Amino acid sequence: MKIEAFTKTYDQRTVLDFPGIELQPGKIYAVIGANGSGKSTFARVLSGVLPADRRQKPLRVASVGYMPQKTYAFRMSTRANLLLNGTDRARAGELMDALQLRPLENKRADRLSGGETARMALVRLMMRRYALVILDEPTAAMDMESTSISETLITHYVQQTQCALILVTHSLQQARRIADEVLYFHKGKLLEAGPKQAVLDHPTRAETRQFLEFCGV
């Protein structure tokens, strides 16, 4: 799966200049970088929420699943929200059990806490199969237990569906735990990409090294 080069400009200022990359099925790509480095803009353009400049088409994939930073819930039960994205009730039950949502299945989803809403949104996405999945800070609102369970589910989902998965994360520990590859963004550019051990332990760019040192890696 190829992501073509593209740019994104706001008010005549280029906030993202992406050179393109080839994604492999069955792999998790962690996107890291400081705030304002272009990570979420990258995710939003790939998902189709934001258009790239000059009608560029960075991605030609039939099925893309996207979980934004700010998840949403319709004013219906948690279970009904999940079944909007698939009618497999057994699958919904399995995922609710895995992410400890069963006690909340009849609760109105728009009254869930931030962490509960994030878990519901992740389950809702996993009700379907996609060629590409994009998760933007999916566990930021979760506690440690829910984060651990979610990471296991994400890994299993990728293994089962053989999708390519882009994980935008502020947690280098999370990138180290579940990613296969790491993409480092700096000031709107992809500066370094490769296997996680190479990027996190032996970065080639000075900017990457400085970022990792600042994060205590």
Model-assigned labels for residue ranges:
Residues T71-L84:
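Conserved catalytic motifs of ABC-family nucleotide-binding domains
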Residues R108-L112, E116:
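Conserved ABC ATPase signature
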Residues V133-D136:
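Catalytic Walker B motif of ABC-type/P-loop ATPase nucleotide-binding domains
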Residues R89-L104:
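Conserved ABC ATPase "signature" region
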Residues Q197-V217:
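C-terminal boundary and immediately downstream tail of ABC-type ATPase nucleotide-binding domains
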